[in-house]
């Protein structure tokens, strides 16, 4: 029996044939990705966290106001959603998913047996169970937002010290959301990548940029010049640090992101649920009214780059996706299926209102 570390290195990953299965899902009127906020609870209070924004779930209740589940009800509820949607890939987010680690220890093997690839996104504030490393189709993504000078302030109590302790002997991916303060010190970007590239527990490093809501003005927001610099400076680092996943095309998508959810391939391909397992998170995983012109989502950027790849002559992947979505929408309509994303049908364009002037008293 190989050790958990060896087993992890042999885990299956999404391949070209899986993308063909995904295409088949779309033609059948089903979205190939599913995201579930499995709990409203989180011991962190991170500035700029979209999940706890007042408009994350639109004009309804906030995430903290929803009723969530635990025990058998959570296990059965998540598995039932996966059976309903039949996705190729499931993301389990929060809140902090590891608050429900007992339930996850039942959910994750069940999803693996169904042939579903699963990613758990965690702060690693709670230790990751060692036996999860033996689940073939499971990936753990640990959020580490900057070097300790920023991360330990923003994401306490999930400090560097606690993360390194809780991932010891595991296999994880690192997900980094870059914010404005991290752009101020020369060498910061490479220092971060070099540190995590050197950790034996880390398989890959993913990068996203902070994505604001429309009308937002916050210290985390990046300027257009910042995005251009990141698109220029980060891709060369992948040649020095092999764990960094940073295609040139993905970096360019940060500079020219999708103009709207209708143009975002990730938004079209994913159905997203909040902690009551019935409220939809729209128009994408960010919820609320995200400023797509400043989108920095790593998955959105990667898919936005991919959809521009030529297939044959002037035909691009985007053309095939649009045609497939049109077919899938009709199939879902005739089968009375409501599992597909809302943005598979035309939506009224959101108008960006100017921010209100606040008068100090």
Residue spans for each PLM region:
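Processing junctions and N-termini across compartments
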Residues: 36, 40-43, 258, 286-289
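Radical SAM enzyme [4Fe-4S]-AdoMet core and its adjacent flexible, acidic
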Residues: 1, 61-62, 114, 137-271, ...
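Short, hydrophobic beta-strand segments that form beta-sheet elements in well-ordered domains
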Residues: 118-123, 270-272, 279-281
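Flexible mid-to-C-terminal extensions adjoining Fe-S/redox cofactors in radical SAM and related proteins
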Residues: 2-4, 30-32, 276-361
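A structural signal for short, well-ordered beta-strand segments
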Residues: 34, 38, 140, 174, ...
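Short cysteine clusters
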Residues: 42, 46-49, 264, 284, ...
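Conserved alpha-helical substructure of the radical SAM core
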Residues: 2-131, 319-326, 361
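Secreted/processed peptides and extracellular or luminal domains of membrane proteins
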Residues: 48, 52-55, 270, 298-303
């Amino acid at each position: 029996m190989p050790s958990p570390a060896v087993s992890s290195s042999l885990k299956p990953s999404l391949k070209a044939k899986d993308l063909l299965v995904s295409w088949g899902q779309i033609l059948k009127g089903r979205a190939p990705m599913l995201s579930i906020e499995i709990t409203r609870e989180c011991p962190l209070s991170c500035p700029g966290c979209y999940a706890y924004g007042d408009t994350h779930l639109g004009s309804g209740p906030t995430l903290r106001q929803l009723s969530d589940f635990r025990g058998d009800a959570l296990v059965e509820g998540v598995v039932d959603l996966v059976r309903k949607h039949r996705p190729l890939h499931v993301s389990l987010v929060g809140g902090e998913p590891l608050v429900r680690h007992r339930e996850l220890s039942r959910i994750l093997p069940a999803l693996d047996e169904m042939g579903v690839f699963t990613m758990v996104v965690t702060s690693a504030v709670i230790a990751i169970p060692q036996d999860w490393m033996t689940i073939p189709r499971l990936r753990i993504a640990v959020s580490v937002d900057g070097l300790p000078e920023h991360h330990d302030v923003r994401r306490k109590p999930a400090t560097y010290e606690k993360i390194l302790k809780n991932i010891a002997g595991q296999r994880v991916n690192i997900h980094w959301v870059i914010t404005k303060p991290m752009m101020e010190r020369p060498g910061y970007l490479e220092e971060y990548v070099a540190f995590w590239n050197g950790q034996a527990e880390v398989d890959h490093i993913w990068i996203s940029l902070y994505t604001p809501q429309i009308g937002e003005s916050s210290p985390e927001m990046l300027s257009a010049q910042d995005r251009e610099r990141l698109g220029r400076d980060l891709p060369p680092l992948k040649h020095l640090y092999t764990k960094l996943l940073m295609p040139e095309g993905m970096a360019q998508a940060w500079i020219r992101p999708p103009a709207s959810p209708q143009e975002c391939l990730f938004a079209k391909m994913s159905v997203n649920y909040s902690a009551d397992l019935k409220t939809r998170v729209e128009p994408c995983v960010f919820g609320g009214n995200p400023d797509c012109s400043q989108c920095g989502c790593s998955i959105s950027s990667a898919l936005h780059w991919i959809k521009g790849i030529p297939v044959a002559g002037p035909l691009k992947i985007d053309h095939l996706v649009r045609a497939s979505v049109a077919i899938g929408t009709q199939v879902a309509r005739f089968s009375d299926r409501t599992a597909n994303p809302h943005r598979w049908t035309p939506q009224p364009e959101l108008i960006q209102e100017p921010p209100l002037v606040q008068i100090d008293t």
